[in-house]
Amino acid sequence: MIDSTLQKAIHWNIELSADLTEKLLSVAQLKTQLKASEMDEARIAHQGTSFVLEGTVTICLQTPNLKTVNNIVMGKGDWFGNYDSNNSSYTPFFITGIGTVKLIHFSNFDLHRLALENFEIYKWFHSLSLGTKAKWLQSQLMMSENKLKRVVYLLLELAANTSLLRGETPKISISQQQISQITGIARQRVNEVIKQLEKEGLLQIKRNCIYLTDLTGLGYKLNQVDLSFRDPRLMIKN
């Protein structure tokens, strides 16, 4: 069970009964030092539901041949995971932690046990799926765009989930290899896009991080993109 300060930090998406909330909090686990296997192999995403307390994660949907077909960014205050009891050898998601990540995790073992006691939990499950719907739909639209726009969209989504002081240049702790894995774009093509954007003065490359030096200019790259489900440019806090 987590302490009272962490309990108050959780946003449940919908109003839940005091009984269910208390039972959920009783099985909540704080995850602060995630192993590489938990992140890279997405074990934590397939073994329950997690609330992002700090940091950012990207969730990528893959086909069985490991080709990325969709990706979304989840930041502080967001939920992700798989609460389906169906055990399958095929695990379609992989996740990448951007910077330091802290989670409050609810294991499937505990969630399924609680579901037998209180059907209200399914209302909560439904709210979690609705919470990511717009991101997944926008991600599907982005897959039809060219490489440059897909990379820019990812960078702006990451910026939207980065806490900034007024006037501060966003620093995204991500490598070009990670961008390749997340977007499904070949590493060489990602390098070409990043170099082009740097040449235009829109970003600056450092070791394992990228500074977004011109957010407005990057945003212009998406002017002709259909952002009807989600526009990260409107969500950047700066």
Question: What are the residue ranges of the model-derived segments?
Answer:
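Polybasic "coupling" helices that flank or enter modular domains
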Residues: 120-184
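Cyclic-nucleotide recognition modules
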Residues: 71-128, 134
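Long cytosolic regulatory regions associated with cyclic-nucleotide signaling
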Residues: 1-2, 83, 128, 145-152, ...
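A residue-level structural signature of the nucleotidyltransferase/glycosyltransferase Rossmann-like core
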Residues: 49, 71, 103-104, 171, ...
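Cyclic nucleotide-binding regulatory domains
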Residues: 37-99
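Cyclic nucleotide-binding regulatory module and flanking cytosolic helices
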Residues: 1-38, 80, 84-86
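Short loop/turn microsegments at loop-to-beta-strand junctions
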Residues: 28, 46-47, 170, 188
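Phosphate-/nucleic-acid-contacting segments
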Residues: 160-238
